[in-house]
């Protein structure tokens, strides 16, 4: 049975999920959505969604920053907790992941690692390697994300 909220939403090729405190991951998500649309994909960008906001199949692209001691942004924490507690069946979800953080901390990109772990434990399959952007090396995180996206798009086409 398809939940009511699923039948009411439009289906995008790729759902971008951002977790951000200061807006950096949101900017990256919006930039990548534009690039994906230029490449012929339809997208939906959700900033800090709940589990019920997400399709239970298809392709997700997670973009999140890390704060404090490997902490998730406040707007992504509810989704992470839902994944951990509910363990939904995400066997029909494939995902890519981008983390933004500072190598000054030993928990560099800890937030993306936490969400990745939960997605995989729910059966989601990762496409490609996770991009971890060190903000000390990249003033504009959209730049390395765009380079990574080109490779990731090729993986989507061959998958």
Residue ranges and their predicted role:
Residues 7, 12-13, 18, 23-30, ...:
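FMN-binding flavodoxin-like domain, especially the glycine-rich phosphate-binding loop
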Residues 37-52:
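A short, well-structured beta->alpha microelement
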């Amino acid at each position: 049975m398809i939940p009511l909220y699923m039948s009411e939403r439009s289906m995008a090729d790729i759902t971008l999920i951002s977790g951000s405190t200061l807006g950096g991951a949101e900017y990256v998500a919006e930039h990548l959505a534009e690039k994906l649309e230029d490449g012929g994909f339809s997208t939906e960008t959700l900033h800090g969604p709940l589990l019920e906001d997400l399709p239970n199949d298809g392709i997700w692209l997670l973009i999140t920053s890390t704060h404090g001691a490997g902490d998730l942004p406040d707007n992504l924490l509810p989704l992470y907790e839902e994944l951990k507690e509910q363990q939904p069946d995400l066997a029909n979800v494939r995902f890519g992941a981008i983390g933004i953080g500072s190598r000054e901390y030993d928990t560099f990109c800890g937030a993306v690692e936490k969400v990745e772990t939960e997605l995989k434990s729910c059966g989601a399959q990762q496409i490609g390697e996770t991009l971890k952007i060190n903000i000390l090396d990249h003033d504009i995180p959209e730049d390395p994300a765009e380079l990574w996206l080109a490779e990731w798009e090729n993986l989507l086409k061959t998958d």
